[in-house]
Amino acid sequence: SDFKRFAKYYDPEVFVEAGRIIRQRAQSYDDLEYTERAEKIAELFGTFKNPDKETVLTPWRVVNLQLSKTIGGLRYFDENFENTTLNGQDSITWVETEITKEVFKPNTKILEINSKTGLYPLYVASSLFHQKRNKLNDDRAGRFSKIDEDEIIQEVLKENIYI
């Protein structure tokens, strides 16, 4: 069988170590601001290869292209979806489409039924976070803390995103 033929190349120690390295990288993002953290997580997933012919891990660039052109939200790429920076600055931009206000309303409920990497719900969650943080910024004239931001992301994950 094919499995027996390839089993000799499987080294459990390498597999375990690779998993440990990935977890360490992901944990190193914990102290970043949420928008930057989302971008770093997406970059990490970009290092993964499609595991087989039937499974396609949609790249972050494609997730941004599809969602920003349909529902709008927080786009992490330039207008051509080629770069995440422009003149040394993040290309992060809020995009409005015909349905953006309907999709990204405060009480919206987003159900992701086919999540493999979680990049689609990550895009939506970071967009909702961005909106709510901007509202908090306006309401408090810029006076809010990391604790306030933590509460926003927890609210988004609890009230708006379902996987």
Predicted features and spans:
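Class I S-adenosyl-L-methionine
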Residues: 1-163
